[in-house]
């Protein structure tokens, strides 16, 4: 045993473990209460003792490698005060060298006990060199560390924290002053402080991930909207189709004719060349026209309304009509069918087309507002055999309602079923033939106090006697057919009027100016041609 057994007890209280000169940094020695101020003299005496050098072989032979490793780990893991650690870093000790030395200690511990050296405590590095310790790591010890005692030097924080440990990024004004190194860690297990460079890199990665997720969400939303649009698109009309506004009179006329055809009235199409399918054999176009002219000249008319009725029911579509009607017809008739004739050509050169019940393209009526149906299925219109635009013997004969007196109007209303009680109201209001066509549903219901059924019946009967399909379209002023001052047109030889009543009808006039309307009574059937001229306000509702 050595002379000073009190100082040779290999306990944690007075044992210093180190690796060569690095013991200044790696050695851990806690103060013992029994050590007094004469410790330095005892250390000097003990260092000069030749038996002190024999301690190393004994220690190495008596201590197992596991004991060396446990003592080393316990010395490294002992925490020190914050002030001592802060002073250690303020000395300017490089953190990289410090970590390198600690890693070498761990490597030497794993290799074997020969790498560990246990020596007695001494006050200076010169005494440790005299004890024969290994000097190969002398350059790694900073020069500034030799001026302080081992008591003032404390163990730095443990090794680097694992990669999966929680990191705390703090700003510079919240960090401890010694955490400026790129690899500095916190002493608290499980947490560590990220340096500024690593914190910025982590923030950039998080921002990039956030932007990628947002872009992915936006793309998925766009794809979903596109799929929904493709699913619901066939159910909705295109905006340009739904909000299309007709441009020009030609477009208005085309839309008007298509509207009439769509609602099953077809008043604008003539008899097809091959004739309608029926009980009788079909008649060729030229022969049928010639036979009709002969029948009109002889006054034989009973069978013709049936043919015109068939023309209204078996009218062709607009797309098929020009191609089928162009065969076997002269250019004049074809031009009249295609609507290329002008208003000046209608009275003179368009007699054949008008005789067949066709209106030229320039004389098509404008479309009804809001697509109001004016077909044969509508109960508000007197369609007759040709949709109300054409008159024949099956329809009510046109009467001069304008010449009716108040008594005539009262008799007319009293003669209708369910309207007899309202004849007195018409007499009190002074309704005569001129004002009767001007009455609207609002006048009849609100002003005169009629019920809805009688009011509609009166308007339907007035429209039937006027022969105007637009009378029941809720217009306060019906579309005028011709001014009252006009004389009956001159009839061509071989043509006769429908009945004696039509000779005294309001269709009086010699020659029509352009833009007015005139009835064409030809081949035993009356045809009303509507021209595109604006009516005179003084010539309304005849």
Curated annotation (Swiss-Prot):
Disruption phenotype: Double Samd7 and Samd11 knockout mice show shortened and disorganized photoreceptor outer segments, reduced light sensitivity and delayed signal transmission from rods to rod bipolar cells at low flash luminescence. Show an up-regulation and down-regulation of cone and rod genes, respectively in the retina. One of its GO terms (biological process) is retinal rod cell development. SUPFAM superfamilies: SAM/Pointed domain. Its main location: nucleus. GO terms for cellular component: nucleus; PRC1 complex. Residues 273-285 have a biased composition (Pro residues). Keywords: Nucleus, Phosphoprotein, Repressor, Transcription, Transcription regulation. The modification Phosphoserine is found at residue 499. GO terms for molecular function: DNA-binding transcription repressor activity, RNA polymerase II-specific; identical protein binding; PH domain binding; SAM domain binding. Residues 268-364, 486-542 are annotated as: Disordered. Residues 404-469 form the SAM domain. Expressed in the outer nuclear layer of rod photoreceptors in the retina (at protein level). Predominantly expressed in retinal photoreceptors and pineal gland. It is found in: Nucleus. It comes from the Eukaryota. Residues 499-526 have a biased composition (Polar residues). Pfam families: SAM_1. InterPro entries: PcG_chromatin_remod_factors, SAM, SAM/pointed_sf. The modification Phosphothreonine is found at residue 342. PROSITE patterns: SAM_DOMAIN. Component of a Polycomb group (PcG) multiprotein PRC1-like complex, essential for establishing rod photoreceptor cell identity and function by silencing nonrod gene expression in developing rod photoreceptor cells. Self-associates. Component of a Polycomb group (PcG) multiprotein PRC1-like complex. Interacts with SAMD7 and PHC2. This is Sterile alpha motif domain-containing protein 11.
